[in-house]
């Protein structure tokens, strides 16, 4: 399976880079994983609603340019569908069974995802009703993908 994680903005924090690198290294035994960072749109602190939509639209265009037509897309969003780790593992296994070999997970910037990206998504996923920095979310996602593979192979992993 080929998994792509698309994020808005460049990851700067060393501790997050190290955590993500560890999980992507572990995932190499199970799948092909690729990370794509699209540039975030520079914007002032205070934005009108119209300016916010414009920023999300530009970031969304950059995201959509990285997604092929045969890719199953998950959009990460607070309002997305929540799952247990076991349910997530079952979903990934089912996608592989039905021949969906390319999966992309999309993490938006600080303003969230553009409506166009949400429309392109085949499904949404939420890890919590809480708000997390999008850079931290990338590491949490990598851990959950790794956990899913361990669950699907009946391999031990901390609960």
From Swiss-Prot:
CDD domains per record: RlmH-like
InterPro entries linked to this entry: Alpha/beta_knot_MTases, RlmH-like, tRNA_m1G_MTases_N
Binding site for S-adenosyl-L-methionine: 76, 108, 127-132
Signal peptide: none
Catalytic activity field: pseudouridine(1915) in 23S rRNA + S-adenosyl-L-methionine = N(3)-methylpseudouridine(1915) in 23S rRNA + S-adenosyl-L-homocysteine + H(+)
Family: Belongs to the RNA methyltransferase RlmH family.
Subunit organization: Homodimer.
Protein name: Ribosomal RNA large subunit methyltransferase H
Taxonomy of the source species: Bacteria, Bacillati, Bacillota, Bacilli, Bacillales
């Amino acid at each position: 399976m080929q998994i792509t994680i698309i994020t808005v903005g460049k990851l700067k924090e060393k501790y997050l880079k190290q955590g993500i690198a560890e999980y992507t290294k572990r995932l190499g035994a199970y799948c092909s994983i690729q990370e794509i960072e699209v540039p975030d749109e520079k914007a002032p602190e205070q934005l009108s609603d119209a300016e916010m939509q414009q920023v999300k639209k530009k970031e969304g265009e950059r995201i959509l340019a990285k997604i092929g037509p045969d890719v199953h897309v998950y959009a990460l969003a607070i309002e997305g569908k929540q799952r247990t780790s076991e349910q997530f593992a079952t979903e990934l296994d089912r996608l592989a069974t039905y021949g969906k070999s390319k999966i992309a997970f999309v993490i938006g910037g600080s303003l969230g995802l553009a409506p166009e990206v949400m429309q392109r998504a085949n499904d949404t996923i939420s890890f919590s009703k809480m708000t997390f920095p999008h850079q931290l979310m990338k590491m949490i996602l990598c851990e959950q993908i790794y956990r899913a593979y361990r669950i699907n192979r009946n391999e031990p992993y901390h609960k």
